């Protein structure tokens, strides 16, 4: 009985360690400046994953609108904006979705994956050209 309990506990620990999720809040870090920019909440809707900006860390930019957006988000507040759309899980990666850069209004193909349980790699790309940022889990 004691051995069974130890085995079950060990199995649950291993399972939860390996089953890390991208769902949650992430602090975005600008890959060019190293500055913290915002908090993005990633969530699952149906079989797909989405992300929206829930906080902007620079007080001067909290009221900013997406003036360079060319889709339905044009002139909408960046705070609360859905910037990641339609990601699908493929093993340990999430891909086939898009990400919006509210600074320039451009929409890129998107792929994300966990580097470790507290670091998320976020890649925006067009064909062979890409940028990858590391986002930090926010609690």
Predicted regions and their residues:
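Central antiparallel beta-sheet cores of small beta-barrel/beta-sandwich binding domains
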Residues: 30, 35-100, 107
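Well-ordered beta-strand positions
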Residues: 43, 88, 113-114, 136
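Short, exposed beta-strand-loop hairpins at the edges of beta-sheets
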Residues: 102, 109-113, 119-131
């Amino acid at each position: 009985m004691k051995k069974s309990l130890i085995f079950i506990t060990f199995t649950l620990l291993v399972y939860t360690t390996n089953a890390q999720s991208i769902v949650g809040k992430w602090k975005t870090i600008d890959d060019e400046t190293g500055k913290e920019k915002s908090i993005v909440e990633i969530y699952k809707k149906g079989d797909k994953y989405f992300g929206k900006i829930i906080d902007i860390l620079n007080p001067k930019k909290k009221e900013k609108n997406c003036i360079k957006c060319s889709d339905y988000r044009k002139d909408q507040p960046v705070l609360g904006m859905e910037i990641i759309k339609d990601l699908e899980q493929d093993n340990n990666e999430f891909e086939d979705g898009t990400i919006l850069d509210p600074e320039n209004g451009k929409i890129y193909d998107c792929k994300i994956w966990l580097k470790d349980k507290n670091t998320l790699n976020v890649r925006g790309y067009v064909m062979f050209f890409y940028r990858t940022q590391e986002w930090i889990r926010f609690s």
